[in-house]
A protein has these predicted regions:
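Short, functional N-terminal and low-complexity linear motifs
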Residues: 1, 19-20, 51, 131-140
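Histidine/acidic residue-rich metal-binding segments in metalloenzymes
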Residues: 3-97, 101-119
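Charge-rich interaction surfaces and accessory domains that mediate macromolecular binding and assembly
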Residues: 119-176
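Conserved small/polar residues in nucleotide/adenosyl-binding loops
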Residues: 177-182
Length: 182
């Protein structure tokens, strides 16, 4: 049996894994996005997706999912495969930055109890890089926020992220107002 320190966190794409798997400039850009917000450059997103896929496949994963907590009170997942059949009968392992960052353009397939018609249920998942991806049951789970195309929160994470952003902004404003001038 393995010792706990050997396997604890071994299925999490955390800072240790990012440092080991990502080129330095990609790692720095990703960390900047995590701390300051904003969008990832396409090249950075592709490099992160490739490193994440390679790491997940090394750990036995064949699929990935955009994982989130909708307002139904449970978790929801949209599964896709890294595997694409090739013309010669083999397989191609693919996972792009676009697939990492954004998922499911049609929210009607998620657990909503059939409350909306398909044309009314437009929503999408967006990767939250501040939460680490992890592997569960040979599936790479990518933590995401779930929003409507109009920007309304359709999950429990989006309001939390927005609250953290608002608190950070106002705290910095108060600190600037109350701190002595140099």
């Amino acid at each position: 049996m393995s010792a706990v320190p050997e396997y604890f966190g071994s299925l999490v794409f955390d800072d240790r894994v990012m440092k080991a798997k990502l080129p330095y400039d990609v790692y720095v850009s990703l960390k900047k996005t995590m701390y300051e917000g904003g969008t990832l450059d396409t090249a950075v997103a592709n490099a992160v997706a490739d490193a994440m896929k390679e790491w997940a496949v090394e750990k036995g994963a064949t699929h990935y999912t955009h994982w989130f907590q909708p307002l139904t009170g449970s978790t929801a997942e949209k599964h896709d495969s890294f595997i694409t059949p090739s013309p010669d009968g083999g397989v191609i392992m693919e996972f792009s930055g676009k697939e990492l960052i954004r998922g499911e353009p049609d929210a009607s397939s998620f657990p909503s109890g059939g409350l909306r018609a398909t044309f009314e249920a437009r929503g999408y998942t967006a990767w939250d890089p501040t939460s680490h991806a992890f592997i569960k049951d040979k599936t790479l789970c990518i933590p995401t926020a779930f929003c409507s195309y109009g920007g309304e929160a359709l999950d429990k994470k989006t309001p939390l992220l927005r609250s953290m952003q608002a608190l950070n902004k106002q705290t910095l404003r108060c600190l600037l107002y109350t701190s002595p001038s140099p």
